[in-house]
Amino acid sequence: MNTSMHTPGANATPSRPRPVLMIPVRRCGSHALRLRLNFNPQFFSPYPLHIVDFMPLVPLYGDLADDNAYFRMVVDVIGLQAASMVKWPDIAFDPVDVFDAIRDEPRSVHRIVWEMLLRAGSRHKAAVVMDKSLDSVHYADELMRLFPDMRFLNVVRDPRAQVASMNKAIIHEFDTLLNTQIWIDAHRRACDLLARHPERVLTIRYEDFLADEEQTLMKVCTFFGIEFLPQMLDVTRSVEANQIAKLSALWVSNCFSPIVANADKFKKQLSMDEIETIETLTQEYMRLYGYEMMTDARAAMDDKAFRIARSRSDIGKELAWRDLKERNFRDYTLRCYRADYLARVRAGLEATQGMSGQFNCSAVA
């Protein structure tokens, strides 16, 4: 990523909230935790921006030391937030204000995202702001350079249950092998981060949260330095939980207490061959996190298996989008709008960026 080093300013401001990133991969029960923690006014975690989807566009901006390029990135990232399925409450961002606030700091798309998060958190008088963009674990090193006080909440879930959930989610692949690989890549990053910075990372298991919500939430609150509140245990009172449950089937269960028996639901959702595939690839992490295996974990996989998996997933994704369009027009339209926004940003960058790398708006005037 292209960054231009400047003297840091806002990082050193003690009145700003502490930044926290939840890691490492979606469908781990992350919304359940976020929605409960949000009952504490000291804590603020809006619907995630998932900047990972913006990252392929970053090279198109060229040298971020160029004010023109960096300001345009600020405008586009703020636009991405506006195009998100769930809007952040009670705040609107002025690109000029955001740009002026961070122009003399290390330049990065992540600095823009976190300026927005920290401003939103400050507006809500929060002491801690958490980004639930779990995929940003892949950018943890840069985030720590930008924010030396950043902490990480590492949420682990049984890979068999998590992959079974990922297989049904339009945000992931529609194949067990491919989703298992995503799971491994994310947890490899998380484990590396934990090994190098153990004091910055708290690891919790989703299954432990299912078994004892109160103890798990108390542990997280202690790590964040905020107070545990009993109302965190009644998510049915969460306005946001009820709001997002109506938007997407992915979130419909978030306005209810989790069902402990669902931890083993993967046994009915996956074939034994799929379970063995997952266990073969993730056995190192399953042992590390204390999950018992059901197979000998000796599944054979080669390049052909991955090619078949890719083809199967592509077909499944196409069918899933068709089904979503028929089943839930709100979810479909909102997701398409965000995807269209990213496509428009890419098209605009490609159209206005001349051979010199400078932006030429007259090209599309």
Residue ranges: model-predicted function:
Residues 39, 45, 51, 161, ...:
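Active-site micro-motifs of SAM-dependent methyltransferase domains
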Residues 44-131, 136:
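PAPS-dependent sulfation machinery
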Residues 30-43:
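A conserved segment at the C-terminal end of the G1
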